[in-house]
């Protein structure tokens, strides 16, 4: 289970850098914040990844969330194979997209659902819809919440963009080059888990706000859990006429069959999904109140389209995934139990080694922040940004060398799947004890 060579990954990374920016197709994969050679993966089965050098890892990325059932699940594989016999793309409606939409509306209570090709497309489309429905132009987001890479949302964003930037009540600077300040000026920024700040912003600007978009449980600043008073403040934004938009791209169908909103008792006007809803294939969706969704073309005036939207392979994978989750009511309890045991074991390993670590967890999502504060006390973007990223990088490399593939960023969640068992838990905690203790590999 220990890493011995990265020869083929190194060679592929060198080739990739000659033809792809940074050698990867999504920044976090480059290991820039943790150092070392990014592993190029050959295959994935169950709870394991195998790289091009034949090293096997217990996987806690799960393709950044979609693989809640584990990699190469036989039911999902069979559903994709069956769909493949009928063709790969139609550019016309198909039965599976109707079936998946019916299932999503039943599980979540959404009045209508529209499928797109990514989480970014989902959030981008939902906010365009909110503007079209309300006739207003401003959007409110929260510092450290990541909603994909649409221009107007790359403002005080999380994920690979996490910084210590100082925000204000109102517009803030873009988080990326290439985003005009004019775009960013239409995005107002507030503090996650600060109900007073949100209330103040809405009193001042609420009449101009089309939507407030939020992660019910933050995953791209590390896991941040909402406080009850913040949840109450979120519901109050509706009084201004603004729409409440839940970004459940990460949490949808992971924390419950109705995602984090169901778990927390939230009632958003619109919800965005991705990851699990496509069973590991490229997909996104947005949906919610029927009167709002009826503003989407061709029924309404808000345009949104996509060549591959409703792709039959993605619909088959998503349908099989959600049907499997619904048919196994005990899966969320098992995911909870495994992740709780993982958190407890990490806590004990860090304490034994004298390494400052603070663990945040909800269901099968977890972040171990390298900070000397109590578990669960990291609640904001600014709190998370105080983490010891150098210490985390050292620990990450120690885990990787011992056959455990953790998220290669301090500011990301890890994801547990139904394929993780006591065997993987024991391997992980043994690796953690050695990595925290600095034991040579």
Swiss-Prot record:
MF (Gene Ontology): glutamate-1-semialdehyde 2,1-aminomutase activity; pyridoxal phosphate binding; transaminase activity
Localization (cell): Cytoplasm
Positions of modified residues (N6-(pyridoxal phosphate)lysine): 275
Names of required cofactors: pyridoxal 5'-phosphate
A Pfam family of this chain: Aminotran_3
Family, similarity comment: Belongs to the class-III pyridoxal-phosphate-dependent aminotransferase family. HemL subfamily.
Cited PANTHER family: GLUTAMATE-1-SEMIALDEHYDE 2,1-AMINOMUTASE, GLUTAMATE-1-SEMIALDEHYDE 2,1-AMINOMUTASE 1, CHLOROPLASTIC-RELATED
NCBIfam families registered for this protein in UniProt: hemL (TIGR00713), PRK00062.1 (NF000818)
Protein name in UniProt: Glutamate-1-semialdehyde 2,1-aminomutase
The organism of origin for this protein: Deinococcus deserti (strain DSM 17065 / CIP 109153 / LMG 22923 / VCD115)
């Amino acid at each position: 289970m220990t890493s011995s060579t990265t020869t083929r990954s190194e060679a592929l990374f060198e080739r990739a850098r000659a033809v792809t920016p940074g050698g990867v197709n999504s920044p976090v994969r480059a290991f820039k914040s943790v150092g070392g050679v990014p592993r190029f993966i050959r295959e994935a089965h169950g709870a394991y990844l195998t790289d091009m050098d034949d090293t096997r890892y217990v996987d806690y990325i799960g393709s950044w969330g979609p693989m809640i059932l584990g990699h190469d699940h036989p039911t999902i594989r069979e559903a994709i194979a069956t769909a493949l016999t009928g063709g790969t793309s139609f550019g016309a409606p198909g039965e599976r997209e109707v079936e998946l939409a019916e299932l999503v509306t039943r599980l979540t209570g959404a009045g209508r659902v529209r499928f797109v090709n990514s989480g970014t497309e989902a959030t981008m489309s939902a906010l365009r819809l909110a503007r079209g429905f309300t006739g207003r132009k401003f959007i409110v987001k929260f510092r450290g919440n990541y909603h994909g890479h649409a221009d107007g949302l790359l403002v005080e964003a999380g994920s690979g963009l996490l910084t210590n930037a100082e925000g204000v009540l109102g517009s803030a600077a873009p988080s990326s080059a290439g985003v005009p300040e004019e775009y960013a000026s239409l995005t107002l920024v507030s503090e996650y888990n600060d109900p007073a700040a949100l209330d103040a912003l809405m009193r001042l600007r609420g009449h101009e706000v089309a939507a407030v978009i939020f992660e019910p449980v933050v995953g791209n600043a590390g896991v941040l859990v909402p406080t009850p008073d913040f949840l109450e403040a979120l519901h109050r934004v509706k009084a201004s006429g603004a729409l409440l938009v839940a970004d459940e791209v990460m949490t949808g169908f992971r924390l419950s069959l109705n995602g984090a909103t169901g778990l927390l008792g939230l009632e958003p006007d619109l919800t965005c999904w991705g990851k699990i809803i496509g069973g590991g294939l490229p997909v996104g969706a947005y949906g919610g109140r029927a009167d709002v969704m009826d503003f989407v073309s061709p029924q309404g005036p808000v345009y949104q389209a996509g060549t591959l939207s409703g792709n039959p392979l993605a619909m088959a994978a998503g349908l099989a995934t959600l049907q499997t989750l619904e048919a196994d009511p005990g899966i969320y309890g098992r995911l909870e139990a495994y992740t709780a045991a993982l958190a407890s074991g990490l806590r004990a390993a860090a304490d034994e080694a004298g390494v400052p670590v603070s663990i945040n967890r909800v269901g099968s999502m977890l972040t171990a922040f390298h900070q000397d504060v109590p578990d669960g006390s990291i609640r904001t973007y600014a709190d998370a940004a105080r983490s010891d990223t150098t210490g985390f990088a050292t620990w990450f490399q120690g885990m990787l060398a011992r056959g455990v593939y953790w998220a290669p960023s301090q500011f990301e969640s890890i994801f547990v799947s139904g394929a993780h068992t006591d065997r993987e838990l024991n391997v992980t905690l043994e690796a953690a004890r050695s990595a925290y203790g600095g034991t040579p590999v």
